[in-house]
Amino acid sequence: MSTWKAVERSIASLLGGERVPITGRIRGSAPDVEHPWMSIEIKHRKGGLPKYILDSLDQAHKSAKQDQLPVAIWHKKGKKYTDSVIMMNLGDFIEHFGV
């Protein structure tokens, strides 16, 4: 099994979902993971995330109090605030939402 398929399968399992095979799927017609309340698209990269994104998540973690969920929000100038992207570590997501 290829690495990206194994990554999709492992993350699907962590979230209580099931990987959707790509066979017969048209891009955008189905998520990578079948889940009751989330549409999950997984991206796996050899190089990882850019440092500025990792730094923002690290800053959120360092400033979070005990019961706070550390998130980083990225807003693109000129876009609506509700179109901003929210990021968090998967482990924090699972712990907070009890998935």
State what each model feature region is:
Residues 1-99:
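Catalytic phosphate/metal-binding cores of nucleic-acid and nucleotide-processing enzymes, i.e., regions
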